[in-house]
Curated annotation (Swiss-Prot):
The gene is VETFL. It is found in: Virion. It holds the Pfam family Pox_VERT_large. Acts with RNA polymerase to initiate transcription from early gene promoters. Is recruited by the RPO-associated protein of 94 kDa (RAP94) to form the early transcription complex, which also contains the core RNA polymerase. ETF heterodimer binds to early gene promoters. Keywords: Activator, DNA-binding, Transcription, Transcription regulation, Virion. It comes from the Viruses. This is Early transcription factor 82 kDa subunit.
Length: 760
């Protein structure tokens, strides 16, 4: 998806005097943005057509009248920019602001009939009064003294407006956000059976029973009113709404028309099952998706004094509604969606700019998101919040060094705050100084801080570090400064795994990521390999007291994940491995048959490789010794699990030959990794910015010109799946499709060459 750099369009303010001359012109934007803007075109037009209208040269201010202002807020903001003390009148050249003139543009210097002038509501939102205002607002301003009337209106202003807007627009220019939009139209109407609507519809006077209702364009039903939006025209009679009762009597007197065939409507549903039918949404709701090239924390928090922008919905953190109550806004990490009957892409992008600008300052928009998954491991599972216990650190935007002590370049420990709380312990009050949360800065520059006063000491997850070498913070009740992983992550000291084995053995099924930890074998393998070996453990604690040549599961280093059959096959070949997974043994016949190879035994747990080892421990000694699985146990495995022998007698039929355990087709050797042939296709979901969507767009003309089917959705999924398989790609979300395009171009050119050879 191609992103386009997007900015706020410049605005202009014209201040008029009593002679209708413009005594002050203020452009609101950066200088570099104004030259090719809509408002500069307006300025040049006035300059060329009324050369004497401007009495002074224009000024340039990096400011903005936010279009979510109400009229009274806009007057207050503009009045403050101009530095006026008197109330003002807000009007414009091509649209109406403070006052509305029917079939015309309100001009306070030329009012011919005051009866035709109506004031707009002070609570009206700017973008709702004038829909194209996003392109560049032109604000004309004057006062009562200049026009000799009392049309000026009061205003609302707070310095908070200026502070917020100034910081947000500076952030927008600084970050140079790039966007891309897509539009989806909803269905024109939907039909619902709803018992509650029966009373409203059947309460129409003298209208005893609703048989059925059918609708075409230009109609809607609300309560017991039927409205036709266009004036009646007999030429379009067949398009109108028709309602009948049993006697073909119509007792609705407003906009009701007629029909010749009652069955046209009664056949839709069985009349005995009809309770009521409610037709919704005459005009389709439009959903606009605006994608951007940064990361947004979708859980926005709108400050209480920033109430001139959008409203939150209290219950859901990422769903908002605009100030008119007509636009639903849903935020996500990579895009924002807007759903309304009447919204333009320009307005959606305008909202997006301000949401990103606001969030970057107040909601910590980061260039990278907080890590959720590392090598198929979820840190949140090892560092869990529970009710009031907040162990997961939060992301912060800046570091308050007045509350922290710098320990290293990437770590700050919190100071104790002795001014706060007392805590009861029995009947005695105990002084309890609180500690500000520790702060850690990771390699991506993300700043993590412990947010709980009783879990304010930061440490690092041992399992995550052992498996991946990544320092992932978690909050603890006690300091971790003596922990070896802590010293590695904070001070850069070399981490050395403890050679001493942990005597606690866990049940099979849990991931073993630390090289010093142990796990039991699966039940059947344990019976096979350990039936003649001895182990004694303490009940309830699973602590090993004694072990003699006992086979267990241990972590494998380097930590390895197996995602598909190819990776499993390669691992087996490279490591001379016998690999267990889901009660199945996987290996290669050469590993089984070659007596000079000593295979290693592995098992997959949650797609991660673990190894089998033998352990020994004396009862009067705490040390546990580890050794490889002995040959006797390996032979037990070989004998227990059957392996297909080579086919010695040659078989040949229809061009296919099997000899010496190998398959030939027309004399050519087939190189296969397994005797089982299978093709695995991943499910695709044709989403915006996905490879599957890009493929459909690439072949759109071909499909439109050549494919005819009743189910395009099914065809598209099959078509895209095959293309992905040919390209050896999986469906994914991308920002850059240059590699995919090259593959498709090469594929298309190969097809053209092949076809030309065929026809020649």
């Amino acid at each position: 998806m191609d992103y386009i750099e997007t900015f706020i369009n410049p605005q202009v303010i014209f201040l008029y005097n009593e002679n209708k001359k413009i005594i002050k012109t203020i452009f609101l934007s950066k200088d570099s943005m104004i030259e090719d803007s809509h408002v500069m075109t307006v300025y040049n037009y006035l300059l060329s057509s009324h050369s004497d209208i401007f009495e002074n040269k224009p000024q340039f201010i990096n400011d903005h009248v936010i279009l979510t202002f109400t009229l009274e807020q806009a007057r207050g903001y503009i009045k403050n920019i101009l530095g006026l003390s008197d109330d003002i009148i807000l009007f414009s050249i091509w649209n109406n602001f403070d006052y509305y003139l029917k079939n015309g543009i309100f001009d306070p210097y030329n009012i011919q009939n005051m009866l035709l002038v109506e004031p707009n509501d002070d609570k009206s939102i700017l973008y709702n009064i004038y829909q194209n205002i996003v392109e560049g607002a032109v604000f004309c301003v004057t006062t009562n003294k200049n026009i000799g009337s009392q049309l000026a209106r009061s205003n609302v202003y707070s310095s908070v407006y200026r502070d917020y807007i100034s910081e947000i627009i500076n952030n927008i220019y600084k970050n140079r956000y790039a966007m891309k939009s897509s539009i989806i139209d909803a269905m024109e109407y939907s039909i619902n059976i709803d018992f509650q609507d029966l009373l409203r519809i059947s309460n129409i006077p003298d209208y005893n029973k609703t048989l059925c209702i059918s609708a075409y364009n230009n109609f809607y039903i609300k309560g017991n009113k039927i409205t036709i939006l266009d004036n009646f025209d007999s030429m379009y009679e067949s398009k109108y709404l028709k309602i009948y009762d049993k006697n073909i009597n119509i007792n609705i007197y407003d906009d009701v028309l007629y029909v010749k065939k009652l069955s046209d409507f009664t056949d839709i549903l069985n009349k005995y099952n009809i309770k009521s039918i409610n037709i919704k949404s005459l005009k389709p709701k439009t959903t606009i998706y605006v994608y951007f090239n940064t990361f947004l924390n979708p859980n926005l928090t709108i400050e209480f004094d920033f109430d001139f922008f959008i409203n939150d919905t209290k219950k859901t953190k990422n769903i908002f509604i605009d100030l008119t109550g007509k636009i639903n806004i849903m935020t996500s990490q990579s895009h924002i969606s807007y759903r309304s009957y009447n919204i333009s892409t320009d307005l959606a992008k305008y909202f997006t700019l301000f949401i990103l600008g606001y969030s970057h300052i107040f909601n910590k928009v980061q260039s990278k998101a907080k890590i959720k998954k590392i090598d198929e491991l979820y840190p949140s599972r090892y560092c869990q919040n529970y009710k009031d216990i907040k162990r997961q650190p939060i992301l912060i935007d800046h570091i308050d060094e007045s509350r922290l002590i710098k320990i290293s370049d990437n770590f700050y420990t919190g100071k104790e705050d002795s001014t706060k709380t007392y805590q009861r312990k029995g009947t005695k009050k105990v002084y309890d100084p609180l500690k500000h949360g520790d702060v850690y800065i990771d390699s991506n520059g993300l700043k993590y801080q412990c947010s709980s006063i009783y879990y304010s000491n930061m440490g690092f997850l041992g399992n995550i570090y052992s498996a991946t070498g990544i320092c992932y913070p978690c909050c603890y009740s006690k300091p971790k400064i003596r922990d070896t992983i802590f010293n590695t992550c904070v001070h850069g000291t070399k981490f050395i795994h403890e050679e001493k084995i942990n005597p606690i053995i866990v049940n099979y099924g849990r991931l073993i990521l630390n090289p010093s930890n142990l796990s039991n074998l699966p039940y059947k393998l344990n019976l096979l390999l350990n039936s003649k070996n001895q182990i004694r453990i303490v009940k309830h604690t699973n602590r090993i007291i004694l072990a003699k040549n006992y086979t267990v599961i241990m972590a494998y280093q380097p930590s390895t994940i197996i995602k598909d059959f190819n990776e499993m096959y390669n691992f087996i070949i490279e490591n001379n491995a016998i690999l267990f997974n889901d009660n199945m043994m996987y290996t290669h016949k050469d590993i089984i048959e070659n007596n000079n190879i000593t295979p290693s035994i592995f098992i997959l747990i949650q797609n991660r490789i673990h190894q089998f080892k033998n352990i020994n421990k004396e009862q009067d000694n705490d040390n546990i010794t580890v050794s490889i699985v002995d040959s006797n146990k390996i032979n037990l495995i070989k004998n227990k699990f059957s392996v297909l022998n080579n086919i010695t007698k040659e078989i040949s039929e229809n061009g296919i030959t099997v000899k010496n355990g190998k398959c030939y087709i027309d004399g050519e050797l087939v190189k296969n990794k397994n005797i089982t042939y299978f093709t695995k296709f991943s499910n695709i979901t044709i989403r915006p910015k996905s490879i599957s969507e890009y493929i459909l767009k690439y072949f759109k003309k071909y499909i439109d010109d050549n494919i005819y089917t009743d189910n395009y959705f099914l065809f598209n999924k099959i078509f895209v799946t095959n293309i992905l398989n040919i390209m050896h790609e999986n469906d994914a979300i991308l920002n850059d499709f240059s590699v995919i395009q090259k593959k498709l171009d090469d594929m298309s050119s190969d097809y053209i060459v092949t076809q030309s050879k065929t026809y020649n």
